[in-house]
């Protein structure tokens, strides 16, 4: 299930993005400040390049690039 990013509370969205950009293995030694990484993800969500996917079985949300999301989730 896709969750529109603009329907989340600002604090909730920020925590979700911060969790994503600070997750082990996502920085690859990148020294970019947290605020910049959060801004980039927020922009990708706004442009429709990234989406928030909710898995009802695990009750977890994850950020994904739009082209990596199974097409059936867009129907």
UniProtKB/Swiss-Prot annotation:
User: What Gene3D superfamilies does UniProt report for this protein, alphabetically?
Assistant: YehU-like
A Pfam family annotated for this UniProt entry: UPF0270
Q: Which residues form the signal peptide?
A: none
- Similarity remark: Belongs to the UPF0270 family.
Protein name as catalogued: UPF0270 protein PFL_4336
- Record organism: Pseudomonas fluorescens (strain ATCC BAA-477 / NRRL B-23932 / Pf-5)
